[in-house]
Structure formats: C-alpha cells, structure tokens
C-alpha cells in the first residue's frame, strides 16, 4: 500500500463515472450537466468500461481494497453493472446515487457485486426536495431507497448536505432514520469552496452539539475522523440512561436506534489527517484531494501509464486544511503543536470499526 509524505496510506479510490446528472441541486458545483437521458453508453469524454476496470486493477495492485462509484449520477451509465462485475474480487464496491434509477436495477447491481449504497435525500418534504434538487423526483427517490433495502443493501445511507436551506430539516431526518430499520443518515457539511455561496454555510458544531445531547452513544470512525451518533427513536421511549442496553453484542444498534454520521471537512485538519482516498475524474484524471484541481494527472490508456500516475498522485498528496504536520530537522514529519492540539479538539473516543464508506 502506498503512503504519501504525511504518512497517510491510500486504501480507497473514488471513481466518477460521469459528470452528467438528472438533478440540478442548488448546492452542487456540477449542476445538471450534460445529456441526462439514461441509462446510456459512456459519452466520448467519459472513461470507457475497459479503462475504469484497468484502473481498478492497478489500484488493487497498490493495496487499494475499496472503491466508491460516483458521478454526477453514476446510474446514467448503462455499463455500471459490467464495471462492478469486473472489479477485483476482494475490492469492496459502494456507490453514491440519487436513487431514481435503483428500482429495476438494484437487484442486478447487488448480483454484480455492489455492497453498499449512499442515496442523496436532503429533505422529507416533496416541495422542499423539489426546490433543493430542481426536480420532481421525490417519490422516485423514496422508491429507490425501498429498492435498495429490498435488494439487501442495508444499511442504506441517506446523504444530506447541511446548509442554510436544509438545516431546519435535520431533526426530522434524524427521527426518520432512528425509527426506520435499515437506514442511516450522513450529514455532509456544505463546502462553499466547491459550490460558492459562502452565506449558505452554517456552524456545523451546532449540529454536533445537538446530536450529542440527543445521542445514546457516540463513537468516531478513523476515516476522516468522522463522529457517529447512535440515536433512539422517540417512539421507542429510550433515553441516554438506556445506552448500555441499546448496543447489540456485535457493537451495532437495536432496530429502534439509528446512526447519524457527520462529514465535516471545512477547516478541519483532523479530517485531512485521516483521509486515505484518491479520486479519479470522469474524464481520466487522478487527483489527491477533492478540493484541489491543481494536481490533476492523466491516467492514460495503458496499465503502465496508470501505475505511474497513481504513484505520482499519492506521492504529491498534501492536506488541504492546514499544515497539521511539519518537517523535522532530519527530514521527517511531526505534529504541528502550534496549529493543532495533539489531543485534538474532540473527546478521545476509541475509533469504531470502519464498516461502511
């Protein structure tokens, strides 16, 4: 497994299969790009099936054991099942989607090897959802969630971007996943660097504090140092005093309890310190960081060129948020105590098992 100069190994890749999307979400930096008919064959500027599979084989050579397929909307690709089926056998495959194409395809995707899915759902109300996504597909998304559950993809993660227009919907989304077995909620901090409109950003610590008061149990994932909150359904009548009884023997949750995870990268050096992914764009460029476009390296067509691009990308990865590590006199790296408290700003929870992407 390759490591960058900051000691971060690369164990996962995110592969964008297209920048096309049938939604036009107001917070997205790729708003409704391209031909949104689907599913269709890859466009001329999109990675072919063979190039995607060849790249995944190269990543696997370097110890990468997980891939997340993204877009745009990856299900606009008609070859999605073929890509998943040809992914190395011991590489975990997950996908982020808006869910509208899952009915009728979810079972085939699972049969091909898909293991997990994240579905974007930013509100529980049809009108609010339409305003956020510029689509009338709310019912189709709900059907997609059900199709994923029926196909055996539980737990299904619902992705919700948290910013001014959606902050008021967080409590009902939390109640929804707490009351519904098989669902989890991933709250994603709005990133104005990618989408503009800095006035839409909110203080994500307020959401952390609210969830901490509500949660029965709190833990932290090693990846990105993400905080997880296990929350009981209000209908279940459970309180924090019942936390010891709310945990199953394998460390999971009982059916009347849901998990909420916060992805909060903005200004968070601990997030960067625990990032173990590189990204491949839909048109064949590797990048070491989602927020940067000054480090793009084309993967070319051949296995040899892909190996060279992968090595170079990993070697040149630099944390986006803060110099949390500094050079020592002997050329090594050490924690920058002036920038980041060694213990961090969070309570020292034990890292949880990294069971989902």
Curated annotation (Swiss-Prot):
Keyword flag S-adenosyl-L-methionine: yes
Binding site for [4Fe-4S] cluster 1: 21, 25, 28
UniProt EC number: 4.1.99.22
Chain segments carrying region Disordered: 232-256
Function in brief: Catalyzes the cyclization of GTP to (8S)-3',8-cyclo-7,8-dihydroguanosine 5'-triphosphate.
Gene3D superfamilies: Aldolase class I
Gene: moaA
Record-listed GTP binding positions: 14, 68, 96, 157, 277-279
Cofactor note text: Binds 2 [4Fe-4S] clusters. Binds 1 [4Fe-4S] cluster coordinated with 3 cysteines and an exchangeable S-adenosyl-L-methionine and 1 [4Fe-4S] cluster coordinated with 3 cysteines and the GTP-derived substrate.
Residues bound to S-adenosyl-L-methionine: 27, 72, 120
Taxonomy, superkingdom: Archaea
Domain Radical SAM core residue range list: 5-234
Source organism (scientific name): Halobacterium salinarum (strain ATCC 700922 / JCM 11081 / NRC-1) (Halobacterium halobium)
Catalytic activity: GTP + AH2 + S-adenosyl-L-methionine = (8S)-3',8-cyclo-7,8-dihydroguanosine 5'-triphosphate + 5'-deoxyadenosine + L-methionine + A + H(+)
GO aspect biological process, one term: Mo-molybdopterin cofactor biosynthetic process
PANTHER family, per the entry: MOLYBDENUM COFACTOR BIOSYNTHESIS PROTEIN 1, MOLYBDOPTERIN COFACTOR SYNTHESIS PROTEIN A
The protein's name in its UniProt record: Probable GTP 3',8-cyclase
Enzyme class: lyase
Keyword entries, A-Z: 4Fe-4S, GTP-binding, Iron, Iron-sulfur, Lyase, Metal-binding, Molybdenum cofactor biosynthesis, Nucleotide-binding, S-adenosyl-L-methionine
């Amino acid at each position: 497994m390759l490591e960058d100069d900051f000691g971060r190994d690369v164990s996962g890749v995110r592969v964008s299969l297209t920048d096309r999307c049938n939604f036009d979400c107001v917070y997205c930096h790729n708003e409704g790009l391209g031909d949104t008919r689907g599913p269709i064959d890859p466009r001329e500027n999109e990675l072919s099936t063979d190039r995607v599979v060849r790249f995944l084989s190269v990543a696997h050579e370097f110890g990468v054991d997980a891939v997340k397929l993204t877009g745009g909307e990856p299900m606009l690709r008609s070859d999605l099942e073929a890509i998943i089926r040809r992914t190395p056998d011991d590489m975990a495959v997950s996908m982020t989607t808006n869910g509208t194409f899952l009915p009728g395809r979810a079972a085939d995707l699972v049969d091909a090897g898909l293991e997990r899915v994240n579905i974007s759902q930013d509100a529980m109300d049809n009108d609010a959802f339409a305003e956020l996504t510029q689509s009338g597909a709310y019912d189709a998304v709900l059907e997609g969630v059900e199709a994923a559950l029926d196909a055996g993809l539980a737990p299904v993660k619902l992705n919700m971007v948290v910013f001014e227009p959606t902050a008021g919907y967080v409590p009902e989304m939390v109640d929804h996943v707490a009351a519904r077995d098989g669902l989890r909620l991933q709250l994603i901090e709005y990133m104005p660097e990618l989408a503009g409109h800095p006035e839409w950003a909110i203080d994500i610590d307020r959401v952390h504090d609210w969830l901490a008061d509500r949660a029965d149990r709190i833990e932290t994932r090693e990846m990105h140092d993400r905080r997880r909150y296990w929350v009981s359904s209000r209908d279940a009548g459970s309180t924090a005093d019942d936390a010891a009884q709310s945990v199953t023997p394998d460390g999971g949750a009982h059916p009347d309890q849901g998990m909420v995870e916060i992805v909060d990268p903005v200004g968070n050096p601990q997030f960067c310190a625990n990032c173990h992914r590189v990204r491949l764009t839909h048109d064949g460029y590797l990048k070491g960081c989602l927020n940067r476009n000054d480090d793009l390296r084309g993967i070319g067509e051949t296995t040899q060129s892909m190996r060279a691009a992968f090595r170079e990308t990993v070697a040149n990865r630099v944390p986006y948020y803060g110099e949390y590590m500094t050079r020592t006199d002997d050329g090594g790296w050490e924690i920058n105590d002036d920038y980041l408290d060694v213990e961090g700003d969070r309570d020292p929870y034990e890292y949880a098992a990294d069971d989902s992407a």
